[in-house]
Amino acid sequence: MSAWRKLYYNTLNLPLKLLVKSKRVPTDPITELGLDTSRSFLYVLPYHSKADLLTLRQQCLSLGLPDPLQPIEINGTKLPAYVFIDDGPRVFRYYSPDPRKDSVKTFHAYLDAHRNNPHLDIEMLPASVMFGRSPGREGHNGVPHLRLLNGIQKFIAILWLGRDSFVRFSPTVSMRQMANEHGTDTSIARKLARVARIHFSRQRLAAVGPKLPARQDLFNKLLASKAIEKAIEDEAKAKKITLDKARKNATDIMEEIAANFSYEAVRMTDRVLSWTWNKLYQGINVFNAERVRQLAQDGHEIVYVPCHRSHMDYLLLSYVLYHQGLVPPHIAAGINLNFWPAGPIFRHLGAFFIRRTFKGNKLYSTIFREYLGELFSRGYSIEYFVEGGRSRTGRLLDPKTGTLSMTVQAMLRGETRPISIVPIYIGYEHVMEVATYAKELRGATKEKEGFMQMIRGLRKLRNLGQGYVNFGEPISLSQYLNQAVPDWRDDIDPIEPQRPSWLNPAVSALADNIMVNINNAASINAINLVSTALLASRQRALTKEQLLEQIDCYLQLLRNVPYSSDMVVPDKSSETLLAHALQTDKFQVEQDSLGDIIILPRESAVLMTYYRNNTIHLMVTPSLIASIVLHHERIHRDDLMKQVELIFPLIKAELFIRYEKEELPDVVNTLISELCRQRLICCADDGILRINPARIRPLQLLAASVRETLQRYGITLSLLNFAPEISRALLERESRILAQRLSVLHGINAPEFFDKAVFSTLVSTLREEGYLKDNEDILKADASALYQVIAKLMSPEIRLTIESVGVTEDNNSAQAIEENPESNMDK
């Protein structure tokens, strides 16, 4: 590098060091993109900008990557280590005025070098730099993305947006592979430049999103749609009002629903949240984000469908996506959050509000459906919670399919952009609402969201541990429909909304697939593991050595027999995980002369079931195997398999387990082998499985994870055994009553133990599996064999309590128990 050029770069670099603090996407490109820092890279930038080049250089040097300003020497010839694909503003034009020709020339020089040197392999590393990510407004002729700003404008942009800049690294491309597969002539060099240009264009659209419409223009377009025009006419006729009044009602609904996205609001909120997360959380862990970035770059319309644990989910996911180089989505939020000042803030951050129910309100449902379709057609990513509300128990709720159904209907409008649904697992080491959830499950009235509740909630924001966001396996909507409904395209109508007969069953199956994929992406943390172990102990206490032994048991199971390829298991030791969990002040430590005892306080037991339930689906199958071996003490492998196959459909439906019936034998055999390897059970050559007395405690604790689930099944099956002909409503009610009684008598702390939805799911599954038959409102049961299998897996005292209570028609006693469900929680 000449002295003059070095002076130029050093001079230009001075203000950049002060003004620019760029973020990397991905955060760790060395690991996520598999970059080898010992190799040489040709850095490919989208357009000519020395500010971008020097910003990239800062990040490269901090990562230990080669210096972009240091030429690469090949056989005595020095070639530049960077190339600009397109033109851009420059103060000094000592280069050729046409970077397009320069890029082709540089690519050809590298390809030619690879032709002459068979052992050479330079990798192209695409990298783009963005200062600000405002998409602009429709109808404005402003220059997009700072692409053609002159030197002064660029300086002002850097001055204002230097700390909102991103350096996006993309996967490398091997020049050796290009030369071998496509040749080395000039046409290949031109093709490389053209492909790079398209790559950067798509990448920028994924990061910035389409231009935003003026809100009133959007309303006018919606009002002009045939579906809404007809709904307005029907509204006027039904309510006997004028068309103008009906149109005013429609506009009011649009005002209530529609987002008012603002880039400046996102940018300022990002600064606040960055400070907030650093103060409140010890870290936000993000996994598998590259698959979403790739979908966005490939032009997919993305629907983010996370599980719903907390109000924090809204902010956390948008924050994570923004820092992954993606445009924050438009978010379907409950109308309960539309209060001052949260409502206007959320609306500027992309939230659109949805009522809890709009059954029977044709005008509202039509407007909401058309608004959702308009978001899709404009290319905005969307986020909604398919569970419909926050889980109060920590387990996934049964999905609500209304918005998902409208998403499928958007496909039936004939839009060409592919729609991909991305299930997302969100996990926390501390959920600030968990105490409120416990009160609501005890029967307390849900407190209405408002300004004062928000202020009280802010006071609880401290020591929140770590957060986890794991992007699950995407579901291509068109591919799903091709498999589920091969002729679905016959129902495409760009004007009239369609509700074909296949819609409801297809959407229900799709919703279940989404829930399974969310569970597949579970991210296990220290609180999940410690809570699971301590709650498995009847006294909610273990010595430190026992607890470490049990955490090790869980970790080995999860690592050696992974539930899915998307799940995340901590790579830390059990000692490190326990030390971290104890720092959260959720557990007590008592010391005596023999060592430490870790205790889960009685008042905290109900709260900690939430964190156990987040990942209970990972443990339930090995726990069932352990429970069968433990209670039988000696059982043949084939008999164990038969029992698992009988019980498993109930567990699969309740917890959205991924295993299909055909793969269950292989899964069970693999888990048995792992339990034998850990010496929890003994496996003989003749197929007999026995308990290992030397390792009985960890086997008991492992088996305990499924204990309450089996007890709940035993309750319903016992009632069916006692009264084979019973109405569904009475069966579900009596099951809940008996579960509440059992929890009081035996100190069962799990709030979901008598959850109405859980028993409803159980009865539905029993019906689907053929154990129940509908005869009008009466169920006819044939489930005695299943009950006998499950009854042998319960303790004698639990079984005695269950079987001593028959179905009672005494509504007074039933009502007394139902009106006081919190009695168990106070024990």
From Swiss-Prot:
Q: What is its main location?
A: membrane
Q: Does the keyword Membrane belong to this entry?
A: yes
What is the membrane topology noted in the UniProt record heading this document?
Answer: Peripheral membrane protein
For whether the record's keyword set contains Plastid, the answer is no
Cysteine pairs forming cystine bridges in this chain are none
Pinpoint motif HXXXXD motif by residue range.
307-312
Where does this protein reside within or beyond the cell? Answer: Cell inner membrane
GO terms of molecular function: glycerol-3-phosphate O-acyltransferase activity
Pathway the protein takes part in: Phospholipid metabolism; CDP-diacylglycerol biosynthesis; CDP-diacylglycerol from sn-glycerol 3-phosphate: step 1/3
A GO CC annotation recorded here is: plasma membrane
> Under which EC number(s) is this enzyme classified?
2.3.1.15
List the catalysed reactions: sn-glycerol 3-phosphate + an acyl-CoA = a 1-acyl-sn-glycero-3-phosphate + CoA
Which GO terms are recorded in the biological process aspect for this UniProt protein? CDP-diacylglycerol biosynthetic process; fatty acid metabolic process
* Keyword set, alphabetical order: Acyltransferase, Cell inner membrane, Cell membrane, Lipid biosynthesis, Lipid metabolism, Membrane, Phospholipid biosynthesis, Phospholipid metabolism, Transferase
Q: What class of enzyme is it?
A: transferase
In terms of Pfam families, this protein maps to:
Acyltransferase, GPAT_C
**Which top-rank group of organisms is this from?**
Bacteria
Q: Which family does it belong to?
A: Belongs to the GPAT/DAPAT family.
Under PANTHER family, the record lists:
DIHYDROXYACETONE PHOSPHATE ACYLTRANSFERASE, GLYCEROL-3-PHOSPHATE ACYLTRANSFERASE
Entry remark concerning the domains of this protein: The HXXXXD motif is essential for acyltransferase activity and may constitute the binding site for the phosphate moiety of the glycerol-3-phosphate.
What is the name attached to this protein's record? Answer: Glycerol-3-phosphate acyltransferase
Organism encoding this protein: Proteus mirabilis (strain HI4320)
**The organism's lineage?**
Bacteria, Pseudomonadati, Pseudomonadota, Gammaproteobacteria, Enterobacterales
